[in-house]
Amino acid sequence: MRLDLSAKFRQVLGLAKDHASIGRAIVQNYNEKAFFDIEVAVVRATSHDDCPVDDKTMHEILFLVSNTPGSIPFLAEQISRRLAKTRDCLVAGKTLLLFHRLLRGSSRSIEQQLHIAHTSGHLQIGCSWFMMSLDSRSFVFLQNYVAYLQERVGWIINQAGKLEPVMSGGTKFSRYKEKSMDLVFHILPKCQEFIAQVLKCSPVDAWPIDNLVQAATGNILKESFQVYMTYSDGMTALVSMLFDLSRPARDLACGMLRKASQQIQDLRILYDKCRGFAGMKSLDYPSVQAISMDHIVALEECSSYGGKRGFSLSTNLRDAITCNELKQEQHSASFSSTSPFSLPVETKISMVWVVFDNEDGEESDKQTEKAYER
């Protein structure tokens, strides 16, 4: 009972602080009334009660910043100040969730301006008091959530509605080979960094902000589904071009494959855990394909052999890899044939005519013609 009274007292005190913050906003001499409305809306969205971020308030913030020039730096300042001043887990978590929803639900222009504000240091989310505390598992989740958002702000939603890492200088690629190389050596490492932060944000044992954690984790999972599809495409492209790379590039590629093997295994475990939560069962989980370390070892061995001989992936090497995969599949039923490492078994028919210098040449030709007529 004492704990309940203490929690109730802290909540009442927090609500009083919220009203005081709104009162201070009223006496501020803002050039634009919209700035006052934005500050009040941020306080309401991140109040000390245990209610989730209100959709109505969220839409109000989006409307205000969309129709008020120069409001994004002001909004970034309000978010940074809210995180720096609060000592309440709920307020900190709701402020981070507000920032996350702004990244997810705003226009592309607002998203880009938030990215610029974070890059310039105007928007600071990593200097909060809970970043130095290890007293509670809730603090640990908030720390991991901050790390995730710092990685997430480096991604942007493209015109197709998919997440992609921000490209410096607006780099464009005109040829398919250039696009494939970019996918492997720029986007794939970014995917691995993104997934690494996702894996740290496990919602297990995150009391006392369970509802907030589940809301945040739901958004994280939805974004991880998109990034995983890009991740899978990148690994497929990496395996396809592995034997065409230089030796240093192949060594780098094999290192990425080893890291991917462990990450995807951990990602499957995380998805299985999250399916057990009521609010996350209905999410559209992707089919995560397992990557066996045995397959990576086989690729590394063939890569080393190919590097010594100085040739690309030949039919003999491809057949060797395929045979190795077939043997591994007999010992491991859990490995899916749709994995990026599954290479098709190819049978190639020689189209070279062979001329026999014997007396039965004409008869052989007739037999050949009959065989083709069939």
UniProtKB/Swiss-Prot annotation:
SUPFAM superfamilies: ENTH/VHS domain, GAT-like domain. Disulfide bonds: none annotated. GO terms for molecular function: 1-phosphatidylinositol binding; clathrin binding. Residues 30-163 form the ENTH domain. Its main location: membrane. Pfam families: ANTH. CDD domains: ANTH_N_AP180_plant. InterPro entries: ANTH_dom (IPR011417), ANTH_dom_sf (IPR014712), ANTH_N_plant (IPR048050), AP180-like (IPR045192), ENTH (IPR013809), ENTH_VHS (IPR008942). Keywords: Coated pit, Cytoplasmic vesicle, Endocytosis, Golgi apparatus, Membrane. It is found in: Membrane, Clathrin-coated pit; Golgi apparatus; Cytoplasmic vesicle, Clathrin-coated vesicle. GO terms for biological process: clathrin coat assembly; clathrin-dependent endocytosis. GO terms for cellular component: clathrin-coated pit; clathrin-coated vesicle; Golgi apparatus. This is Putative clathrin assembly protein At1g33340. It comes from Arabidopsis thaliana.
